[in-house]
């Protein structure tokens, strides 16, 4: 953190002001990971805004991340979907990466669901498995917290109502869902088989390159947070299959209907949780 806190706060407020001018408002935020962005099409009365049209907001450059906000309603609840996210490996600092999340919080959003496509560290979890994040391991080498901010340590365990809402809806809809620890790594390369063995022994169940810093920053801004991973591939060395981003996107698309059914019922409940 090389810039004064006051300057960062002004940057947050500037982006928040630009979001308001774009007509974006919501009660609940949902960040959609690789191959999962199609869920936003389920919203009614949609208002769309490209990240590129919001001055001061970092832009996503990764395939499978459309790079736009879509605001709309589900069951009368105003939802803001972020179709795609930015990552550390795109040359951003932890604070720059979470600037959008903090700005959205200034719009009055009080609950957030962060989703991602992740590599599975368990051989028994086939691609397409959904996992609710119950804890995380941050191996990204930094924190998004500003000087003077404190974190609760595990943002995914502090709001039991959100986790219970996900579990309840999954049971009602007959959607199988696992629970586990998400390990965040810097990327952009996939892990080696040796690293995968280490992460599994470390207590991880899924590995990816996002989500953790966003969740920490969202909690610092006063939002209740929850996380969902779509296991899109076995991590390196668990099977003989080669890893590719194309596979990640394809499995995400295949799981989209089941994933979308879960989100469609869960997100309105977040407004009351």
Annotate each predicted stretch with a short phrase.
Residues 2-154:
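Metabolite-binding pocket within alpha/beta catalytic cores that recognizes anionic/polar moieties
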Residues 104-108, 200, 219:
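Non-catalytic positions within long, well-ordered alpha-helices that form the structural scaffold/packing
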Residues 110-111, 205, 224:
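Short acidic/polar active-site loop segments enriched in Thr and Asp
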Residues 163, 168-205, 263, 270-271:
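Active-site/ligand-binding-proximal alpha/beta "capping" segment
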Residues 209-247:
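Zn-dependent metallopeptidase/amidohydrolase metal-coordination segment
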Residues 236-273:
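His/Asp/Glu-rich mid-to-C-terminal helical/loop segments that flank catalytic regions of hydrolases
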